[in-house]
Amino acid sequence: NLDIGLGSPTAIAFGANSHFPEPYRNALFILDWAYGKIFAVHLTPDGASYRGRFEEFVTGRPLNVTGADFGPDGALYFTTGGRRTQSGLYRVRFTGKPKEESGLPALGQTHLEAAKQSRELRRRLEVFHSEQSIEGLGLAWDNLSHDDFWIRHAARVALENQPIKRW
């Protein structure tokens, strides 16, 4: 759960294909039309989901951003326009030298593997949100008190979608 506040989100793009330094290659870029901002959201695995922290990446007035994508040159291209303002196409590229450290917490392999297993369990439970099954019923009951909120939620929804007479 990440609260950036009020705004008018218009688009997102992942930095995986960028030529930006490491923390930004793993970031999710979120465009806000109303406040003229592009946020970089840095995600870290947290159980069956992710946690995020954000920073302002590009800001301006007016900068009513409407869309974004990374080009084959690794630069971020974004467009602006709307409500009688001048439309535009902009390019953001990295020209410096990458830093040694990303500034993000280093996660151990054990933590990453545990988070991966949690996400796989959540996905297994989510199958039973639309499919009735004895296996799904047992899996849901087994995980109703799981430590992870998202797994508990998936288990509850899976249980709610199974016939009550099988409970």
Locate each region found by the language model:
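Structural detector for internal amphipathic alpha-helices that build alpha-solenoid repeat scaffolds
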Residues: 115-132, 142, 150-161
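Amphipathic alpha-helical scaffolding segments comprising HEAT/armadillo-like alpha-solenoid repeats
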Residues: 102-107, 132-142, 162-167
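Detector for the c-type heme attachment site
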Residues: 94, 144-145
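Beta-propeller domains with acidic blade repeats across secreted/periplasmic ectodomains
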Residues: 1-127
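Residue-level signal for short amphipathic helical patches enriched in basic/charged
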Residues: 84, 146-147, 162
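Well-ordered alpha-helical segments embedded in enzymatic catalytic cores
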Residues: 8-11, 139, 154
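Soluble non-cytosolic domains of exported or imported proteins
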Residues: 3, 146-149
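Non-catalytic alpha-helical coupling and interface elements of nucleotide-dependent molecular machines
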Residues: 94-97, 160, 164
